[in-house]
Amino acid sequence: TYLCCAVFGSAMVKRGQGAIVNIASIAGMRSNPLHAYAPAKAAVISLTAGLAAEWGRTGVRVNAVSPGYTRTRALQAAIDRGDRDPTDLMSQAAMGRLVEPHEVAVAVGFLLSPVASAITGANLPVDAGWLAGSTWQTYGGVPPIKG
């Protein structure tokens, strides 16, 4: 990620315009047992913010997308082998489902588009509400205060 940003970002800075979207993960936003993967994705999020600050006045925007559990071929194969329980994965998301690959692509396209011209340094979770849902589960699904 760093090398791609350095090479392509430098060219964009010279042109005075451009947009980069790095792919991170919700794993980089929360502590979890993925002791190599999670810190690497957290580094992508930090790199994104740092480059956005550094290049912000040059016309180059840098953002990230953090997918949640996405129905990729690899995840589907793990589900088919019985290595992953889709019910468990989906139960952790507020929306009760997996993310579809096209949903990640749409988020990337949005951040690259002129519609997002005022957005830089952002990390957009595309997680079907996994961050919200897993937080809710952490606290035992305590119902909200009424009144």
Regions found by a protein language model. Give the residues of each.
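A short hydrophobic alpha-helix cap/turn motif
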Residues: 13-14, 55-58, 70, 99, ...
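Active-site helix of classical SDR
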Residues: 5, 40, 48
